[in-house]
């Protein structure tokens, strides 16, 4: 291989994947009009998917870098899968909670103006580019583990 043995492809993919996960923790995931953007690091306290996700994504990022530096790329299966599962879980929980608020706000006998405002804002919520950063980081970790597995099976 054209890379030095200490910086083989699985190690580099693991390092860059971990760095992307760490960067993705601060990147905007969801934009809600008037309220602003949510990320794993900037979110309301009652949005538990991001509270837990913050710890999970940053731990996966840190462990991925450590595993890559220790040249243990097979362990990146774990961190990549956990990061991807956390991202999917966050998006599913947000969609479920947003749909519940919108359904409650659409009731004909509702007189709560805050609930009507929240329902209207959530109808126009959209996903942002931070999702792609976290997803690409997780996929890079899985690719690093796959490369290491392929290299180990050839030997």
PLM regions: where:
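Compact integral membrane and secretory-pathway proteins
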Residues: 1-155
């Amino acid at each position: 291989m054209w890379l030095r043995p200490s910086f083989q492809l699985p190690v580099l993919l693991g390092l860059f994947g971990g760095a992307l996960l760490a960067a993705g923790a601060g990147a905007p995931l969801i934009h809600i009009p008037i309220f602003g953007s949510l990320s794993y690091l900037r979110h309301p306290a009652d949005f538990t998917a991001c509270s837990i996700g913050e710890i999970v994504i940053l731990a996966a990022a840190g462990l991925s870098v450590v595993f890559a530096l220790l040249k243990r790329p097979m362990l990146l299966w774990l961190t990549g899968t956990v990061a991807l599962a956390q991202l999917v879980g966050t998006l599913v929980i947000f969609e479920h909670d947003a749909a519940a608020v919108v359904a409650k706000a659409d009731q004909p006998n509702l007189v709560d103006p805050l609930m009507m405002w929240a329902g209207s804002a959530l109808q126009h919520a959209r996903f942002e580019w931070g999702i792609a950063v976290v997803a690409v980081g997780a996929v890079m970790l899985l690719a690093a583990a796959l490369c290491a597995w392929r290299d180990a099976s050839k030997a």
